[in-house]
């Protein structure tokens, strides 16, 4: 959605009761209050960059949910007595704009930390900068493998399953169910796409090479459609289609496969399994798609009585009435902001960037309200893998049938 403003500021305070989904965790007790830039006796300032405009604007709702949640907390009380000022800036999924917005957050606004920013390419552009400044870059909406490098880039942590983990699991699934598969792949022409592609192909090679990739097609985020790529793939003889796309390209490609009458086994990257994306493609067109799952869906009968989904729905009705109940991207944003609030709660009166990082790396075992039962964060100070418990799932035309047992790479 086109946005006129790139900065919005909300002040918020939190009551501990609003974090009902959080696992118990001790507060940091300190003889003296300690602060980094962005924190004081009365305020905690956070930042974020997401595409509120441009080709990735579908994901701008992540920032809107963050605003709403902090506003709700503001109306309730306080995270250890402090208000939250949250600045979500528009980077239009552009690396140069992300650099500009991030520098503004750090150098002008002096935020304590950034959380929930989106996109492998934009976040790569500010990766070294934020680490050189010692500013936490947490719960990134990207699962690039580079974010798991606590030795060299300790200030950066992914918030999604790492893409290579997901790709390896899907490759093993293909080898198991179609050992002689002929695979066509459509992938985003950037680090995001390649982070899936290479480990997927490596698993096929390690399995003996009977299942093999016979055609690869790429697309750029600025491409108006992916129709020509899908036509090429459909004519290639491929009987498996690995769809490594995001946003509107995911919806377009699923719909185009159906229009072409092509009937491959379809694999879809987990970040594109939300109901808003599938609804745009047509649920009937998405039937049979296989994907990795780690999270619940909002707005579906299966989860309507789930306490976490009910918490999101309460927020949505009160603060985000224009957001659809089944917007899984918005629900993901809810899980992230609840987690960020938990990190701040654990910091107590030691609101330094070092302690924010310490509490984030200590989230092992914390269950985000977005996660499926049994899935928790697996972060440790030495391993920033966000989660290691994942599930294979198949879309049945209405909902996801999720495997009984978790899988790993």
Over which residues does each language-model region extend?
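N-terminal secretory signal peptides
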Residues: 1-29
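Beta-alpha junction/loop-to-helix N-cap segments that form part of ligand/metal-binding clefts
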Residues: 32-34, 58-64, 76-149, 159, ...
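Extracytoplasmic "Venus flytrap"
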Residues: 35-40, 47-66, 89-96, 118-119, ...
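Segments of small-molecule ligand-sensing domains
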Residues: 318-331, 339-400
């Amino acid at each position: 959605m086109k946005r006129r403003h790139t900065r919005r500021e909300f002040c918020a305070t939190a009551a501990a009761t609003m974090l009902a989904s959080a696992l118990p965790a001790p507060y940091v007790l300190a003889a003296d209050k300690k602060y980094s830039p962005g924190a004081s006796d009365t305020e905690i300032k956070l930042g974020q960059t997401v595409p509120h405009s441009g080709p990735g604007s579908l994901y701008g709702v992540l920032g809107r949910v963050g605003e709403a949640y902090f506003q709700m907390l503001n109306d309730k009380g306080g995270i250890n007595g402090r208000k939250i000022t949250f600045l979500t800036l528009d980077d239009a999924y552009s690396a140069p704009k992300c650099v500009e917005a991030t520098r503004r957050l750090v150098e002008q606004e002096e935020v304590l930390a950034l959380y929930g920013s989106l996109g492998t390419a934009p976040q790569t552009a500010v990766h070294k900068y934020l680490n050189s400044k010692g500013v936490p870059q947490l719960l990134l909406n990207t699962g690039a493998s580079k974010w798991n490098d606590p030795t060299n880039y300790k200030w950066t942590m992914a918030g999604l399953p790492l893409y290579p983990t997901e790709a390896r699991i899907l490759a093993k699934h293909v080898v198991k169910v179609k050992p002689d598969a002929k695979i066509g792949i459509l992938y985003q022409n950037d680090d995001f796409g390649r982070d899936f592609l290479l480990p997927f192909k490596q698993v096929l090679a390690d399995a003996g090479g009977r299942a093999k990739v016979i055609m690869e097609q790429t697309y750029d985020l600025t491409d108006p459609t992916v129709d020509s790529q899908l036509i090429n793939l459909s004519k290639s003889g491929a009987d498996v289609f690995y769809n490594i796309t995001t946003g509107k390209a995911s919806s377009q490609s699923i719909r185009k496969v159906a229009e072409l009458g092509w009937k491959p086994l379809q694999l879809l990257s987990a970040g594109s399994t939300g109901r808003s994306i599938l609804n745009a493609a047509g649920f009937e067109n998405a039937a049979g798609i296989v994907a990795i799952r780690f999270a619940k869906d909002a707005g579906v009968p299966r989860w309507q009585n789930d306490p976490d989904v009910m918490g999101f729905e309460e927020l949505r009705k009160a603060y985000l009435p224009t957001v659809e109940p089944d917007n899984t991207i918005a629900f993901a944003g809810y899980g992230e902001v609840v987690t960020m609030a938990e990190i701040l709660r654990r910091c107590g009166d030691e609101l330094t960037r070092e302690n924010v990082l310490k509490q984030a790396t200590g989230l092992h075992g914390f269950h985000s309200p977005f996660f499926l039962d049994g899935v928790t964060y697996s972060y440790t100070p030495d391993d920033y893998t966000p989660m290691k418990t994942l599930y294979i799932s198949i879309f049945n035309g209405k909902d996801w049938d999720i495997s009984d047992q978790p899988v790993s790479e």
